[in-house]
């Protein structure tokens, strides 16, 4: 696989209204398919809204829930990645990323780092994921998916990249932390720096899918993006407005970048493993 057409859906959603949000997903997926897309990606918790609080247990569903059948059916022709509240087989409730492809659905990532500070309180309502792993997609190749706060921990993209991800996708529901003033809000420039830095250091594509709109006291800022493996921004969606970015992933760029600068390929994983084990066991520090 050398190229893939990916639509990045920077959307708003209706809090705790699964049916309305599902219909919006289906509409955009159908439009993307007509536009020649191989895949479409939506933000964190795009099927439910973010600030569901105690309703999370009532909204949570197994990945094989019949209510998700419309996405499964559409996925015969287009890969769909979106955010939802997952009910595990053990009845854990997770902030998860779902992937629908070839008529099947699967949970591909459970959010690990649940922010519970300031305006955030995710640990009150969700269990933390316990696995960092890539997923193989027929249309997108080997990808690594993270959810918002996960990407503020360098260990997550580090492990995904070294498992072979040539595309790292982060689903976000990132709100403003203060009233916007002159220039870009700090949270916007921080995320731009994160995307550019990881893309460059790991020589991989980084796709950020953020939402927009207002929800309770939260204002989501959008600015979804695709960054190339040399750390250069390829496309950006606007601030605060819904938009579907139509992007092309040329995976030959990963090869060119890694051959030009081999810092990623030169990483000594055995050394890192040994040193981490020393820290964990208390032999260092």
What are these model-derived regions, one by one?
Residues 2-8:
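Extreme N-terminal starter segment of soluble prokaryotic enzymes
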Residues 10-16:
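Short polar catalytic/cofactor-binding loops
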Residues 18, 26-102, 106-108, 174-197, ...:
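Cys-nucleophile CN-hydrolase/nitrilase-fold catalytic domain and related Cys-dependent amidase chemistry
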Residues 23-37, 154-164:
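Short amphipathic alpha-helices and their capping/turn segments at secondary-structure boundaries
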Residues 63-81, 152-242:
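CN hydrolase (nitrilase-like) catalytic-core segments centered on the catalytic cysteine
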Residues 63-66, 88-193, 256-264:
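Active-site catalytic loop in hydrolytic enzyme cores
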Residues 82-84, 95-99, 133, 224-226, ...:
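Short beta-strand scaffold segments in enzyme catalytic cores
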Residues 252-285:
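A short C-terminal boundary segment appended to hydrolase-like catalytic domains
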């Amino acid at each position: 696989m050398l190229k893939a057409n990916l639509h990045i859906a920077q959307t708003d959603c209706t809090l705790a209204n699964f049916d309305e949000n599902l219909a919006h997903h289906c509409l955009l997926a159908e439009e993307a398919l007509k536009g020649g897309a191989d895949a479409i990606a939506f933000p964190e918790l795009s099927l439910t809204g973010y600030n569901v609080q105690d309703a999370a247990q009532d909204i949570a569903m197994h990945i094989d829930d019949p209510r998700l059948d419309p996405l499964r059916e559409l996925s015969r022709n287009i890969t769909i990645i979106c955010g939802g509240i997952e009910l595990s087989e053990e009845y854990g409730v997770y902030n998860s990323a779902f992937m629908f492809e070839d008529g099947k659905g699967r949970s591909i990532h459970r959010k690990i780092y649940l922010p519970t500070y300031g305006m955030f309180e995710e640990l009150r309502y969700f269990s933390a994921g316990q696995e960092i792993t890539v997923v193989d997609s027929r249309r997108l190749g080997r990808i690594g998916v993270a959810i918002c706060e996960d990407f503020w921990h360098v260990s997550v993209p580090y492990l995904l990249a070294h498992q072979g991800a040539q595309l790292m996708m982060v689903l976000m529901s990132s709100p403003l932390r203060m009233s916007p003033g002159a220039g870009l809000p700090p949270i916007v420039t921080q995320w731009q720096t994160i995307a550019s830095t990881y893309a460059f250091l790991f020589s991989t594509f980084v796709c950020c899918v953020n939402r927009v709109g207002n929800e309770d006291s939260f204002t989501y800022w959008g600015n979804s993006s695709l960054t190339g493996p040399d750390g250069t921004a390829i496309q950006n969606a606007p601030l605060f407005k819904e938009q579907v970015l139509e992007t092309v992933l040329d995976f030959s760029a990963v090869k060119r970048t890694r051959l030009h600068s081999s810092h990623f390929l030169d990483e000594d994983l055995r050394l890192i493993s040994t040193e981490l084990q020393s820290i964990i066991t208390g032999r260092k520090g």
